[in-house]
Amino acid sequence: MKIKVLTYNIHKCVGGVDRRYDLGRIVEIINHHQPDIALLQEVVRHSKSLSDTLQVDVIGEAIGLSHRVWVPNVRVSEARGYGNAIFSRWPLIESVNIDLTIGPKKKRSALYARVRAPIFSQRAGQSQTRSLHLFNLHLGLSGIERRMQLKKLLLHASVQRVAKNTPIIVAGDLNDVWGSLGRQVMGPAGFHGVRRKPKTFPAYAPVRPLDSLYVRGKIRVENLLPSRLAIARQASDHLPLVAELILGQE
């Protein structure tokens, strides 16, 4: 079964060049790509125009992904805290926020969720569901910090308990300036990505592969590309990454 996953640091819906808050641009981009799962970073608590409504709910309703979870990493203030969010076409069975903060560094975390995705079983001759484990990350700014954070994640029970054949997706803003985390950390842990890392930062003229996606188990990456929409170069300081994945059977 083919599924589409989008990962996107939305920069609190503030344009990377014009510095203008515009949630509508973010929604337009996501709706264009029609993902089954969206992993967003830097989602704020409240939208400016709807101060009593959680931004995760506004976005979720606008992109038609009704199953969602959001946890703030950074609390600038109670109203303006921001963090990671997962949106899914299919029900979220469980979720947990995993602290990846290293010492006195800025607070960082991975948001974990498990969904039951539908697949067609040739053996059974009918549609079934299977578990898909999602990890949405926003890693630190130093190379040592990022490697330590990924290793901390890989040792967490939410990863360790998952059987080797069960599909896992690890994606997000990895701040992977040199595109080396796959070779240094994820590959040795049994995860696969793409050989040529798509450049996503800065959005208006990308030169760095800060964002990425890795999989393990009965799932493979068929395509991983940055959005080529003109509006995506304005809406945030990152481009979204869009992945087409092939999900295998149990």
Give residue ranges: language-model regions.
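A short, gly/pro- and small-residue-rich
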Residues: 57-59
